[in-house]
Amino acid sequence: LLIIGALGFILITNDKSNSTNESAKKTSISSSKEVAKKKDLPDAKQSDWDLVLVSRKSPKDEMNPTLATVNGIQVDQRIASAVQQFLAAAQQISPAEHLISGYRSVSYQEGLYQSYVQAEMNGQGTVNSSGNPISEEEAIKNVQTYSQPPRSSEHQTGLAIDMSNIDSLNESQYAKQVAAIAPKYGFVLRFPEGKKAETGIGYEDWHFRYVGLENAKYMTEHNLTLEEYLKLLPA
């Protein structure tokens, strides 16, 4: 009986030891991943021009970037060449791929946003297309699922482009292929699937943001949104 009891005690002790070892292994793996993440972190700062954050949580006044025109769409002149190259590569995937939107001033965004709100209120909107009127509060909630208030849109940076092979968005069979090549030209899909908690915006397969080659590569490899990436960088 004593031997059985002792064995039982030994077995229990081993189980606890195994559990501790497994926990230690998981902690070690997690730590290793964090070390690896920081080890290949680009030499970048939160204040870099191509990493500026504009959102409902981080609104900005008019930024007045120097603009250039690519295929009829205005963008920050510093990314014009990258936009042209990215578009050309995307058109190799789908010849119908085209730029839909680029830079928008704060005043332009305000007019656009208010027109969307009015359309939703009248029942002629993207979400409320029933023909039945709704309150302004309801309309604003609807609009914020697909458009941002003035001072909260990345388009005012001149670093964001909307690009698709169709004008009815989130329906392209080529979208994932285009998103996959984006980092080669310094772009990331700004609002990917499963990241609404981080960005505040649902999946948009057409909205690309220029962040620079090294940043785009790192963000893609580590599945990071701009919000998550900036937290890893010094000010």
Located regions from the model:
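Extracytoplasmic cell-surface/polysaccharide-interacting catalytic and binding patches
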Residues: L1-A235
